[in-house]
């Protein structure tokens, strides 16, 4: 049952996800493609985590955070992709009220953690390249754990705002979400209550996270670039660039899509464009991250060669 009578209001108990397309042939094609992407995402990120665990040369703060970033990538993709894949095969794609709230909260939670982790990793590279003599002190095991816990706490607080907003919304019908998952904007459009204060609070929280993390990343990489340009050793420059380019590529991909979804005015793009960008953000980027790090980071490539016992893999 999609609706229940509650006094003078009709309360929504489930939502219909309209998904990416109604074309049956295209749905099958997308099912195959996205399922393959999800399998590559899980296997690639699990491989990254395992490689970091078993390779002693990767037991450094940067790779400690990278292993957690890989875990978050699996979590972000898993919060949406399995349900989306199943919905390609059914005629009526429905999700319960509770399930919708959990999906929204988990997507926001893991997305915020990823932003914090990328900022922490940028700070780690800043200390390693600009203050190498203080690296062991500034990035001690205790400091790394504190930064990690802080990232999770920040993600939890951010997700709490969105979850509180969701349970405060009054849904009277219709219950058709024009998206492939329970995203915040389509839910706001379906709500029949006054949500202006909650929307401002959620927007402020999102904006704060984006501004703070982008500021940390920008300042860190500006200082890194200045330091690298001052290096006289070509080998030193190459090593510094090697450890930074992979992370900077991931940052560019993530914040490019986040800017499109959350910063650009909604009137500047259509709902279908938003869906495509959301697929890239929640499905494709988690798959690309381990590939980027394995191809562009010499330490990752070296550890992989050592574990596989091969010398000419790359």
From Swiss-Prot:
Statement: the UniProt record of this protein carries the keyword Cell membrane: yes
GO molecular function annotation: G protein-coupled receptor activity; olfactory receptor activity
Glycosylation sites: 8
GO cellular component, one term: membrane
Disulfide topology: 100-192
Transmembrane segment boundaries: 29-49, 58-78, 103-123, 137-157, 200-220, 241-261, 275-295
The keyword Ligase is assigned to this record: no
Entry-linked SUPFAM superfamilies: Family A G protein-coupled receptor-like
Gene3D superfamilies per the UniProt record, alphabetical: Rhodopsin 7-helix transmembrane proteins
Family: Belongs to the G-protein coupled receptor 1 family.
Official protein name in the record: Olfactory receptor 5P81
Organism whose genome encodes this protein: Mus musculus
């Amino acid at each position: 049952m999609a609706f229940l009578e509650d006094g003078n209001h009709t309360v929504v108990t489930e939502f219909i996800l309209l998904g990416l397309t109604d074309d049956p042939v295209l749905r099958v094609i997308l099912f195959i493609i996205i399922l393959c992407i999800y399998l590559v995402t899980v296997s690639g990120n699990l491989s990254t985590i395992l490689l970091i665990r078993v390779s002693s040369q990767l037991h450094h703060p940067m790779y400690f955070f990278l292993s957690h970033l890989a875990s978050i990538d699996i979590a972000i993709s898993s919060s949406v992709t399995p349900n989306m894949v199943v919905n390609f095969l059914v005629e009526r794609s429905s999700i319960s009220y509770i399930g919708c709230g959990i999906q929204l909260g988990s997507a926001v939670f893991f997305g915020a953690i990823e932003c914090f982790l990328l900022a922490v990793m940028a700070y780690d590279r800043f200390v390693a390249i600009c203050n190498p003599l203080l690296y062991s002190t500034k990035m001690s095991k205790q400091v790394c754990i504190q930064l990690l816990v802080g990232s999770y706490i920040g993600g939890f607080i951010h997700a709490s705002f969105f979850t509180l907003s969701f349970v405060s919304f009054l849904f009277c019908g219709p219950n058709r979400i024009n998206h492939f998952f329970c995203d915040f904007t389509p839910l706001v459009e379906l709500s029949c209550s006054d949500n202006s204060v909650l929307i401002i609070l959620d927007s402020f929280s999102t904006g704060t996270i984006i501004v703070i993390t982008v500021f940390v990343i920008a300042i860190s990489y500006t200082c890194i670039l200045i330091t690298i340009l001052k290096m006289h050793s070509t080998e030193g420059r190459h090593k510094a660039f090697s450890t930074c380019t992979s992370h900077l590529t991931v940052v560019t991909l993530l914040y490019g899509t986040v800017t499109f979804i959350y910063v650009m005015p909604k009137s500047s793009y259509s709902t279908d464009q938003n869906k495509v960008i959301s697929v890239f953000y929640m499905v494709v980027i988690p798959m690309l991250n381990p590939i980027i790090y394995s191809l562009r980071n010499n330490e990752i490539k070296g550890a992989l060669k050592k574990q596989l016992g091969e010398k000419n893999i790359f």
